[in-house]
Amino acid sequence: MSEFSQTVPELVAWARKNDFSISLPVDRLSFLLAVATLNGERLDGEMSEGELVDAFRHVSDAFEQTSETIGVRANNAINDMVRQRLLNRFTSEQAEGNAIYRLTPLGIGITDYYIRQREFSTLRLSMQLSIVAGELKRAADAAEEGGDEFHWHRNVYAPLKYSVAEIFDSIDLTQRLMDEQQQQVKDDIAQLLNKDWRAAISSCELLLSETSGTLRELQDTLEAAGDKLQANLLRIQDATMPHDDLHFVDRLVFDLQSKLDRIISWGQQSIDLWIGYDRHVHKFIRTAIDMDKNRVFAQRLRQSVQTYFDEPWALTYANADRLLDMRDEEMALRDEEVTGELPEDLEYEEFNEIREQLAAIIEEQLAVYKTRQVPLDLGLVVREYLSQYPRARHFDVARIVIDQAVRLGVAQADFTGLPAKWQPINDYGAKVQAHVIDKY
């Protein structure tokens, strides 16, 4: 847990005095990552200048840079890393020109962020929480035993300060990395939907479900251990209350409680925000499908015409006269000549009659589900109704049935953020995606 003893003006003056600065273009950052990777493979953690030049040569080749000035550019990059306190250089008078280099804590921190901290692991989080639980229990036992000031510093304050607090910071960092990954997933989904949403639906579903599962896994692990951690912190807090000279322990316990509450609270809030985004994506896809139902045939027809010579096809039609009247202008002209302008009441009479009949039937039949508190599978109900009507009316009938059914209640599975399975509702490929309504 980070604590700053200096004030803001003091820190600013200190940074200005020491001329701190970091500048890492993509090629220099790649060089630093290469050094960290090669350094991790060595037992002594040391690298010679020749090994650094070899690493720089790999990076230079990857960026397709010239190899004629590789030595000069590598030397400049190494000196720049040393100046920015990313590498430490150790020289010896006995072996002049043969320096040894080690990564600084700053260099390790940057490379850890890009390499080791990018992968979420439930096992790693569980091990961290297990270690924290053990440290807190021992600290709580020591606090209840009591003792002199040395006892409190060694057995209570030190484990909380240098073990528990650092692991809490690591968990907090994991959550912040998950925030970045969520934003990256959102950008990937946006790019997929902008290119071809129909082909991207399966990829979007995979990205949404994977992120939801990871967030839920992280939160479940935290909540499972959160109560025990808070209980041990309260034990320590209760033990310090009779002692006025243990304010430093009490302050640290309060900071740890706030950190733990913030971690668990943000985990749940992150899940809620992701559920909202998941619904937004599905709403967009459903809207696009509704708007695109008439475009599907046109797109398939256009593709078939373009590939006719590679894949010939034959058109079978039942009404030759109808085939000649495909232009909108001609159809409108013919309708006006034969029937004139159709009255509004007559135009919607048949549809309104169907809607009234269906509403009465649905209200009567679906009332049984609400009365008996029986789950309502919307896919089965819609399929049953569509089987009673011709294919031409399936779209309107399905819309009416769904509109009436959702007024009865909601599906508790909607709040999990997991998408429902697609269910066929007729024999012509139409499907519906809806959870079972089980709360009226």
UniProtKB/Swiss-Prot annotation:
What's in the GO CC field? cytoplasm; nucleoid
For biological process, the GO terms are: cell division; chromosome condensation; chromosome segregation; DNA replication
Cellular compartments annotated: Cytoplasm, Nucleoid
**Which CDD domains does its entry note?**
MukF_C (cd16337), MukF_N (cd16335)
Which residue ranges are recorded for the region named Leucine-zipper? 208-236
Q: Which domain of life is it from?
A: Bacteria
Keywords, A to Z?
Calcium, Cell cycle, Cell division, Chromosome partition, Cytoplasm, DNA condensation
* The UniProt record lists the keyword Cell cycle: yes
Q: Outline what the protein does.
A: Involved in chromosome condensation, segregation and cell cycle progression. May participate in facilitating chromosome segregation by condensation DNA from both sides of a centrally located replisome during cell division. Not required for mini-F plasmid partitioning. Probably acts via its interaction with MukB and MukE. Overexpression results in anucleate cells. It has a calcium binding activity.
Whom does it interact with, and what assembly results?
Interacts, and probably forms a ternary complex, with MukE and MukB via its C-terminal region. The complex formation is stimulated by calcium or magnesium. It is required for an interaction between MukE and MukB.
Identification of the protein by name: Chromosome partition protein MukF
